[in-house]
Amino acid sequence: VRKHNGSKEMIAAALLHDVVEDTDVTIDEIRQEFGNAVANLVDDLTDVSKPADGNRATRKAMDRDHTAQASAAAMVIKAADLINNTESITEHDPKFAKVYLKEKRALLDVMFKIKHMDIWKEADSQL
């Protein structure tokens, strides 16, 4: 995110983007601690699906729809995360990478607000 001239709020949100999904921390707690701008970005970045919502394809479609409504700043962070995760998963779990890369291609395709940006092109080149 820093490489692509992200703001301090974007960098903070990039560091916090999995906190709500992976811990008991809430968006409201992030808002209290880091302010509205960071909390809104983290909210845009947090997957909305839950295991009870259906199979993986159904959940990923829900999360894609959520991402499609996100701000351009959140999409930049999401693209940076996609780049980082793609490198790691391709190297460490080639079998899962086949599924993962298809999901991320579909995700990147809904991130039209940043399609003109270098970070989108970098993510696109990895898929």
Task: State each model region's role.
Residues 1-127:
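Active-site helical microenvironments for divalent-metal-assisted chemistry
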